[in-house]
């Protein structure tokens, strides 16, 4: 679909060096880099060298950014280098981020700094280990030149691997321009790539909307349980594959509070932690609008009721997905009508007392074995926790599993190690300011097994001191 992209050549960095290589992901992709010189890898994954036969492109898309429509966005500092078929037979995009200007760069330089690229690496690997669908970083390469933001910073290029880079904004780009034929081609391509079970079916475009809604409901439910805040849920950052994409101002929550916002540009709290399900539904409505002329070509308005039903049904889809995981994290057997209230009361309890989201869920598993000391220590007084615990214990009667088995199952759902904001900043600062990758590698070691408590990793489980956490802000890094 040449209308959907523009050819582009990455800018040649003066002195590329490989900062990080994801050997596990490379093996998953079937890339045999064992005998490849690091310098050669650095040139390849910085854009200095182009693989034989590759034709890099920058993709076009539109998007609602903080609710306002931008009809022409596109890859301003990224390009699609090519595709590979991984060892599971799945097609994966290989893209460079920070490789220079493209036809969509507008006034930007198309470059990226080491810090934001390592943030994407760290958080993407954490999400993968947590079982949350995500894009991943194959490599981070320094460029040997500074990029200029508030001050000069060391430049870097990230190699991103994604199921695809098809977004709600991709559809919006052509819908805005009334290019229905292109929308039709794009929809068929999306179906072939991500939802092949729908190919050739009557009503496939409405079914595509429903399938995307299902994947997004599952994804956002996982975000919410992990305490993850994306920070910039614009429609151009909703991937139709159901993967998490674009880790600009993202962060993980410490104290549980629905209004938590970290992004420095989210002044109104549009993308706050507690708003994420509703924003996903809003984005889905924008996707539905682009599909109306495909669902009912003769009269797009006639498609509105069916599309609206799917969009309005997103809330129930999400709630079901969220409650499924909540039951597992609470160690519950079977389903009861009051399970939602039990889970909601737990979250309200955490919010009321400013309790750490991750540790509260994790230490609740101790309580299943009658060892509630660590959980109780998170609260200002035991009395704050006692009434809810009585309800929770009552819900576990009768039970068919032994307490240690219940606790073990709960720990498989509730991680101990997440990318704590102060640890991420510590790692980024060491790499950016001193060229020291040690803190990044140690953090990744902890995050690669988030559910397994291990000796020597206590500091990776603990939230930041109050003075470090207060006022913490993240930035897009553009």
Swiss-Prot record:
Transmembrane annotation, as ranges? none
Binding of Mg(2+), residues: 237, 246
EC number in record: 2.7.7.-, 2.7.7.108
Q: Which UniProt keywords apply?
A: ATP-binding, Magnesium, Manganese, Metal-binding, Nucleotide-binding, Nucleotidyltransferase, Transferase
Chain positions recorded as ATP binding sites: 74, 76-77, 97, 109-110, 160, 167, 246
For activity, the cofactor(s) needed are:
Mg(2+); Mn(2+)
What terms describe the molecular function in GO for this protein? AMPylase activity; ATP binding; magnesium ion binding
The region annotated as signal peptide is none
Query: Which InterPro entries does the annotation name?
Result: SelO
Q: What catalytic activity is recorded?
A: L-seryl-[protein] + ATP = 3-O-(5'-adenylyl)-L-seryl-[protein] + diphosphate; L-threonyl-[protein] + ATP = 3-O-(5'-adenylyl)-L-threonyl-[protein] + diphosphate; L-tyrosyl-[protein] + ATP = O-(5'-adenylyl)-L-tyrosyl-[protein] + diphosphate; L-histidyl-[protein] + UTP = N(tele)-(5'-uridylyl)-L-histidyl-[protein] + diphosphate
- Can you tell me which residues form the catalytic site? 236
Enzyme class of the recorded protein, top EC level: transferase
Pfam families noted in UniProt: SelO
The task this protein performs is described as: Nucleotidyltransferase involved in the post-translational modification of proteins. It can catalyze the addition of adenosine monophosphate (AMP) or uridine monophosphate (UMP) to a protein, resulting in modifications known as AMPylation and UMPylation.
User: Record's family?
Assistant: Belongs to the SELO family.
Query: What is the protein's name according to its record?
Result: Protein nucleotidyltransferase YdiU
What is the taxonomic lineage of the source species? Bacteria, Pseudomonadati, Pseudomonadota, Betaproteobacteria, Neisseriales
């Amino acid at each position: 679909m040449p209308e959907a992209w523009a050819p582009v050549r990455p800018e040649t960095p003066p002195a590329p060096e490989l900062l990080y290589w994801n050997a596990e992901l490379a093996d998953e992709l079937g890339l045999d880099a064992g005998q490849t010189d690091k310098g050669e890898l650095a040139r390849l994954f910085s854009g200095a060298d182009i693989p034989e036969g590759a034709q890099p492109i920058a993709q076009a898309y539109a998007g609602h950014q903080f609710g306002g429509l931008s009809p022409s966005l596109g890859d301003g500092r990224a390009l699609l280098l090519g595709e590979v078929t991984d060892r599971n037979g799945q097609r994966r995009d290989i893209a460079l981020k920070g490789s220079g200007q493209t036809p969509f760069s507008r006034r930007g330089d198309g470059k990226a700094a080491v810090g934001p690229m390592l943030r994407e690496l760290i958080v993407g690997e954490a999400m993968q280990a947590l079982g949350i669908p995500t894009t991943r970083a194959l490599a981070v390469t320094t460029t040997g030149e500074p990029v200029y933001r508030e001050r000069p910073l060391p430049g870097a290029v990230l190699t991103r691997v994604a199921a695809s880079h098809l977004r709600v904004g991709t559809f919006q780009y052509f819908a805005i321009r009334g290019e229905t034929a292109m929308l039709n081609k794009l929809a068929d391509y999306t179906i072939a790539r991500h939802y092949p079970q729908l190919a050739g079916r009557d009503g496939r475009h409405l079914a595509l909307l429903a399938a995307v809604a299902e994947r997004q409901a599952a994804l956002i439910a996982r975000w919410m349980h992990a305490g993850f805040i994306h920070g910039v849920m614009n429609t151009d950052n909703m991937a139709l594959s159901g993967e998490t994409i674009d880790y600009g101002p993202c962060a993980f929550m410490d104290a549980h509070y629905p209004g938590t916002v970290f992004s420095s540009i989210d002044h109104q709290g549009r993308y706050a932690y507690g708003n994420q399900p509703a924003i996903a539904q809003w984005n889905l409505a924008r996707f539905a609008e682009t599909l109306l002329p495909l669902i009912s070509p003769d009269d797009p308005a006639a498609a509105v009721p069916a599309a609206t039903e799917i969009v309005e049904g997103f809330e129930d889809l999400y709630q079901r997905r969220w409650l499924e995981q909540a039951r597992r994290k609470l160690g519950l057997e079977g389903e009861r009508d009051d399970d939602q209230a039990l889970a909601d009361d737990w979250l309200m309890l955490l919010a009321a007392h400013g309790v750490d989201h991750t540790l509260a869920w994790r230490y609740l598993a101790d309580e299943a074995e009658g060892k509630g000391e660590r959980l109780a220590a998170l609260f200002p007084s035991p009395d704050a926790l006692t009434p809810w615990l009585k309800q929770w214990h009552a819900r576990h009667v009768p039970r068919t599993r032994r307490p240690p088995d219940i606790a073990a199952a709960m720990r498989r759902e509730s991680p101990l190690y997440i990318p704590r904001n102060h640890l991420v900043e510590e790692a980024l600062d060491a790499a950016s300011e001193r060229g020291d990758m040690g803190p990044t590698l140690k953090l990744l070691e902890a995050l690669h097994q988030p559910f397994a408590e291990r000796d020597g990793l206590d500091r990776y489980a603990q939230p930041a001191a109050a003075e470090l956490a207060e006022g913490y802000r993240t930035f897009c890094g553009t």
